[in-house]
Structure formats: structure tokens, C-alpha cells
């Protein structure tokens, strides 16, 4: 609130509040936050899944996210070329957020035995959705604001995307920890009823569970699998939580207005006018 009041009074505000009167600026800012949350939800949770459930090292988990980046890069290039050729951009964030929502729901099917090729397909699809959306909304934003506001508007969009990633990471992390505790308690309780002797030999404190994940041979196989199932189920809930967020992004994309793309001549005229105002 203090920031908004201060910006309203400032002669040269960091983020002019009048920009929020621009329909496209407001929508793309919200879309940026949604995409940031979706991006970091995938980027953070997938490596955790690979390290914990699939027993990959941090380096291997990072390398196995290359398909995600391939999806982002390839679809960013594709959408950029299509926009340049046809001058239409609205359909890309609509398609992109729809693909992201479907792909994140597909991630809820991951199990302990899911092969890497299947995960790669899911990652490519998530990346494709991000690639179709992420840069397209920046184009829509830059096309909708005045030339002299383009820099601050673009920076603001990046800020809101970062803000979305921060809140997304916090929300998804909280959901993961909450559901993990629930599934761990439930899984080990069921195991105790089936075989009390097994449970008496293990440490189910947080430190003990961390050790059992890192050193699977230190505990009976059934105990280790119970812990992995708890993690897998917790990841499912995280992805189920992320899907409505990206679905909300789809609704926002539908509301985006498609304005005629500016030409290089338009920008040249705007620069001349801005230079004239500065001299005057």
C-alpha cells in the first residue's frame, strides 16, 4: 500500500500506476505471474522427483530436464516466426496455457517405475506450453503500451513473473511437505499393522527418513518403497495444485485483446516524437 501511494505521488515513479489502466498490461502481468508459478512448479518439483524417487544425482536430474528446455526454446522460436509472418499473437498464450494445464495433469501419473522416456515426453509438453506463452505475452505487452513506457512495462512483467515463481515455489513446497507428512504417517501406519517387527527396526524421524532415501540398502525394501510411494503421492498433490493455476492462466489468455502489431515505421515515428519532446 505504501509503495502504491508513493508511486502515485512520485514525479518519476519506478512503476507508474497508470499502466494498470491498460487492459493488456494488467492481463499480461497476471499471466506472467501464473506462468512463473507454473514454470518453477515444474522446474523445482521434477528434479526433486528425479533425485528422491528415481535416485538420480543432482547433476543427472538437471541434465534430464533438457527436454523441458528444448520444448521452451523450440516453441518460442516457432511462435515468434508465426507472429512475425501473420501478425497474430493471441492464440499462442491460449494454446500454451492449455497445453501447460494438460501436461501438468499428466505429471500426476508419475510413479516409482515411470521410465525416463515417458517423463521426457511430459517435460517437452510442459516446455512447449511455456514456450508458446512466455515470450508471446511480452510481445502483446510491448505492442500495447506507449513507446516511452516499453522499458518499464517489460521490466514490470519480468518482476511479476518472478513474483509468481516465488509464491508458486512457496505454495508448492508447503503442499509437498504437508502431504508428505500425511502419506508417510499413513504408509508407515499400514506397514506397522502388517509387519510390526519391521517398523521396530527403523527410524521414522525426518533425519531417519532422509537417511533411508539416501541409503536404500540400510532399511528393508518394503520400508524404502513405502517412503518412495509417500513422496510420489505428495508430488501428485503438488501437480494437482498447480493445474488450476495454469487453467486460470488459460482463462486470462482468452480475455487478452489482439491489437494490430506495430511496424518498424511506427517505432521510428514514436522515437522521433519522443526525441522532439525531449528537445522541446
Which role does the model predict for each range below?
Residues 62, 66, 98, 157, ...:
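Sparse recognition of residues in long alpha-helices and their boundaries
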Residues 1-10, 175-179:
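Structural signal for alpha-helical transmembrane segments and their membrane-water exit/capping regions
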Residues 4-152, 242, 260-263, 277:
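Transmembrane core module of solute transporters
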Residues 140, 161-257, 263, 269-280:
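Hydrophobic transmembrane architecture of multi-pass small-molecule transporters
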Residues 31, 156-160:
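Hydrophobic alpha-helical segments of secondary membrane carriers
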